[in-house]
Amino acid sequence: MGLRNLLDKVEHHFEKGGRYEKWYPLYEAVDTFLYRPGSVTRTTAHVRDGIDLKRMMIIVWLCTFPAMFFGMYNVGHQANLIFAQSPDLLGAQDGWRFALIGALAGFDPNSLWDCLVQGAAYFLPVYLTTFIVGGFWEVLFATIRRHEVNEGFFVTSVLFALTLPPSVPLWQVALGISFGVVLGKEVFGGTGKNFLNPALVGRAFLFFAYPAQMSGDAVWTSVDGFAGATSLSLAAAGGVDNILGHGLTWMDAFLGHMQGSMGETSTLAIFIGGAVLLLTRIASWRIVAGVMLGMIAMSYLFNAIGSTSNPMFAMPWYWHLVTGGFAFGMIFMATDPVSASMTDTGKWLFGALIGVMVMLIRVVNPAFPEGMMLAILFANLFAPLIDHFVVQANIKRRLARNG
């Protein structure tokens, strides 16, 4: 018996009046994940594109793969570089992860396999925890409300996991995604009704609730007893010269050969996935362009103002592009169609607001060198207001034109 036949055979048990009626959302989630939805229109439909929510979310999920796999490689590569430079640290490591890594691979920084295995030993448990805990809340709320489980959580789960440092405790991962899904989305009605990006809500909660595990110099590698600063922290401490002084070139930063959150280091990998999102029109090019233009304009403004005490004023825009979570946030977070502005003009303004805000936070705030997360959440709050004024301006313009 094929899987399709098996699902069809048990379907009546989950429908209204069936033995497992209350579990229909779970059945529907499995069925639509494995096969296309069976619902059809009852009357003539005017379809511009056959894409549905399921296909859209799966495309976004697949577009994170370049950043995901490079992130796993880079986590392992950074750790193995440290072990090669300080062999004594290798003997000080313990735990189930290192037992697993030792059984499946080695600690050679020049071995692709060794680096991937080490990175996977840190990323996959984080992703699995995110998926299981967040999925539990999705299914619970869908069951209570008696509606289908949406595929949007596939995207939320992977984006949340990719924004975390490799050393984050798994219980904090569970707590963060619970906060993001429940208070960032479900309390407002679920998929399509949230005004904040749930992945960023969860990440912001962890940042403010557990700053010791989300920031500083000791959280960006998987090596216990080692502290290493991110490129953005180096820039905040001494500008671009400080970054270059630590042996990190712009090309290294662009390719992602540096410490940072698991999925945010490689601008190249992020742009590969972003190109697909833009070509398929899932992501709005207006938002991406607005973020870039806002960031570049503010960067030139700060460069012109200058500062003798704050080296971030002199940092060029192309360094801001490849440091921190700017590229990841611009491509995957800012373009969330639910929490972003919906009008064309509003998308430009929404993106520009993010670009301006991230520069203000990075440059002017000495205690917080990264600003993309807060900039996007700030813009999410203003997205409805931006659309309101754009619509009102359009109404006034049409009234003036047509009398």
UniProtKB/Swiss-Prot annotation:
GO MF terms held by the record: FMN binding; oxidoreductase activity, acting on NAD(P)H, quinone or similar compound as acceptor
Disulfide-bonded cysteines: none
Coiled coil: none
Subcellular localization, as worded in the UniProt entry: Cell inner membrane
Transmembrane segments: 56-76, 121-141, 164-184, 225-245, 260-280, 287-307, 312-332, 348-368, 371-391
GO cellular component: plasma membrane
Membrane topology: Multi-pass membrane protein
Catalyzed reactions: a ubiquinone + n Na(+)(in) + NADH + H(+) = a ubiquinol + n Na(+)(out) + NAD(+)
Leader sequence segment: none
In-chain residues carrying the UniProt-annotated modification FMN phosphoryl threonine: 230
Primary localization class, coarse: membrane
Biological process terms in GO annotation: respiratory electron transport chain; sodium ion transport; transmembrane transport
Keywords: Cell inner membrane, Cell membrane, Flavoprotein, FMN, Ion transport, Membrane, NAD, Phosphoprotein, Sodium, Sodium transport, Translocase, Transmembrane, Transmembrane helix, Transport, Ubiquinone
EC number(s) given by UniProt: 7.2.1.1
Enzyme class of the recorded protein, top EC level: translocase
Pfam families in alphabetical order: NQR2_RnfD_RnfE
Cofactor: FMN
Family that this chain belongs to: Belongs to the NqrB/RnfD family.
Subunit structure, as described in the record: Composed of six subunits; NqrA, NqrB, NqrC, NqrD, NqrE and NqrF.
Function noted in UniProt: NQR complex catalyzes the reduction of ubiquinone-1 to ubiquinol by two successive reactions, coupled with the transport of Na(+) ions from the cytoplasm to the periplasm. NqrA to NqrE are probably involved in the second step, the conversion of ubisemiquinone to ubiquinol.
Protein name: Na(+)-translocating NADH-quinone reductase subunit B
Organism for this UniProt entry: Pseudomonas paraeruginosa (strain DSM 24068 / PA7)
Lineage, uppermost ranks: Bacteria, Pseudomonadati, Pseudomonadota, Gammaproteobacteria, Pseudomonadales
